[in-house]
């Protein structure tokens, strides 16, 4: 029986500081690492040199744990559903391109989920189509609360 993990968050080095003041940003030192997105700062969690950011370490950990396949997904605090839509569109495209490159050559072990610019449903739809049809990603992750509008807003 194949063991498949569909809840495997990842952060890519390429995404760090892409949005300037919004982040994402990693800082601190060995004893007090932190990860910041906007005004939110997650302290005490090491990202660099862990399976969270290093695919080699992730594949090694999967092997050691008997996990045959992981579908990588964006870190939920990097969905950026509340920033300017143009920035979100640029970030999502860059993140999704990076996701596709990361799994390239590891398709037997890794898949990927996209992140979408939910500020603009039309652009989110276009990006989902691009990610699944052109980049080979499996689908997308979104936050349940992605705008100040109701989920059934007709936009």
Predicted features along the sequence, with ranges:
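Distinct, well-ordered alpha-helical segments
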Residues: 121-133
